[in-house]
């Protein structure tokens, strides 16, 4: 159970990081 929760937290963290990086690149392209 703990490993599953840790895996889910890591997945959400990776998804958030990817989304933030994508938005950052879009802002750089717009500028």
From Swiss-Prot:
Quaternary structure, from the entry: The 4 large subunits of the cytochrome b6-f complex are cytochrome b6, subunit IV (17 kDa polypeptide, PetD), cytochrome f and the Rieske protein, while the 4 small subunits are PetG, PetL, PetM and PetN. The complex functions as a dimer.
Keywords from the named record: Chloroplast, Electron transport, Membrane, Photosynthesis, Plastid, Thylakoid, Transmembrane, Transmembrane helix, Transport
Similarity comment: Belongs to the PetL family.
Transmembrane segments: 4-24
GO process terms (BP): photosynthesis
Annotated membrane topology: Single-pass membrane protein
Cross-referenced InterPro entries: Cyt_b6/f_cplx_su6
Protein name, as recorded: Cytochrome b6-f complex subunit 6
GO MF annotations, alphabetized: electron transporter, transferring electrons within cytochrome b6/f complex of photosystem II activity
Annotated GO CC locations: chloroplast thylakoid membrane; cytochrome b6f complex
Species classification: Eukaryota, Viridiplantae, Streptophyta, Embryophyta, Tracheophyta
One Pfam family matching this protein: PetL
Signal peptide boundaries: none
Stated role: Component of the cytochrome b6-f complex, which mediates electron transfer between photosystem II (PSII) and photosystem I (PSI), cyclic electron flow around PSI, and state transitions. PetL is important for photoautotrophic growth as well as for electron transfer efficiency and stability of the cytochrome b6-f complex.
Entry keyword annotation includes Transmembrane: yes
Annotated compartments: Plastid, Chloroplast thylakoid membrane
Statement: the UniProt record of this protein carries the keyword Phosphoprotein: no
